[in-house]
Amino acid sequence: MLAAMELAVTAVRDDEIDPLVEVTAQAFIDEQLLRWPLGDHPDPLAVMQAEFRGLHSAAARLGCLWQAGDAAGAASWISPDAADSFWEQLMSWHDGVAAQADDGGARYEQLWDWVLGCYPDEPHWALDSIAVDPAMRRGGIGGLLIDHGLAMADADGLPAILETTRPHLVPYYGKFGFVVFEEGDGPGGGPQVWFMRRPPAR
């Protein structure tokens, strides 16, 4: 197994996203920000693949999708300049969780309106998603991708933001300087979410 330090982090083109869609869909199959609004579905993995095809395509077109090595891991770091266009592209995507949810997407819309409303008004870089190939986990690849995004945020003198529903990831992100600034349960019985911010390096 290659050490993370041996892997280059490179921007991903839209025509290169297929293996990263697979890696990320598998990693997010139990992520409640997507799984809870989906509800009862016979093939949640296929839905996650469709969701991340839209997410990764939008990020790649904006120069915001990064990979470590040859699809060993992927991170979507959304810059403040790209944020509006990123969300506009997603709103036109009709093949993911919202489209296939058992309630027609009502939970998805309600949850994500709440999530985005918890984001700070200040300009920031957002870690929209991060995933590592299961065969390559625990080798530092996730940290490599996080550090890459934080370096871009630091170059702009801006904070970085993320959210997670996985409590074990809160201390993990804390190792990179992220601190919880808000925590709460999503509306309508939605999942517990931790919102974290990492200030720019001094």
Language model: regions and residue ranges:
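Conserved GNAT acetyl-CoA-binding A-motif
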Residues: P123-W125, M152-T165
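Active-site rim helix/loop that mediates acceptor-substrate recognition in acyltransferases
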Residues: H41-C64
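Conserved beta-hairpin
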Residues: S57-W77
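Conserved acyl-donor/pantetheine-binding loop and adjacent beta-alpha core of acyl/acetyltransferases
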Residues: A74-A131, R137, P187-P191
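Conserved active-site alpha-helix within GNAT-family acetyltransferase domains
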Residues: G143, A155-G157, R166-E183, G189-G190
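Conserved N-terminal entry element of GNAT/NAT acetyltransferase domains
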Residues: M1-D18
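Conserved beta-strand-loop-alpha-helix junction that forms the acyl-donor binding cleft
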Residues: D128-R137, I161-V170, P187-P191, R197-P200
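Conserved acetyl-CoA-binding loop-helix of GNAT-fold acetyltransferases
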Residues: V132, R138-A151
